[in-house]
From Swiss-Prot:
It comes from Chlorobium phaeobacteroides (strain DSM 266 / SMG 266 / 2430). The keyword RNA-binding applies. The lineage of its organism: Bacteria, Pseudomonadati, Chlorobiota, Chlorobiia, Chlorobiales. It comes from the Bacteria. This is Large ribosomal subunit protein uL14. Part of the 50S ribosomal subunit. Forms a cluster with proteins L3 and L19. In the 70S ribosome, L14 and L19 interact and together make contacts with the 16S rRNA in bridges B5 and B8. GO terms for biological process: translation.
Amino acid sequence: MIQKETNLVVADNSGAKKVRCIHVFGGTGRRYAALGDQIIVSIKAAVPGGVVKKKDVCKAVVVRCVKEQRRKDGSYIRFDENAVVLLNAQGEPRGTRIFGPVARELRDRKYMKIVSLAPEVL
């Protein structure tokens, strides 16, 4: 579960390394984001010369989440870290590579570009 003020790692090569969630999309009272949900993040650490810089604000989608999520077949999926992929205004990834596995729930949410770039889909 991702909420406001949650620190996350970035799983792409956009230049950002660490981000902090500042808003969860989905209505006024929505508190938590799970796998495949969009959030707004603030860049907290970035590499020099990257696409994004520290203090930038951009959209992101959650690709890995520590809190387990139940699937329709009854199984559960969870990861060791909270990770996001940064998105541009059109909803496509800002980076050209994805690091680490991503959840299968992204395919259901129509993030096909992220799924195709990922080395492994769990």
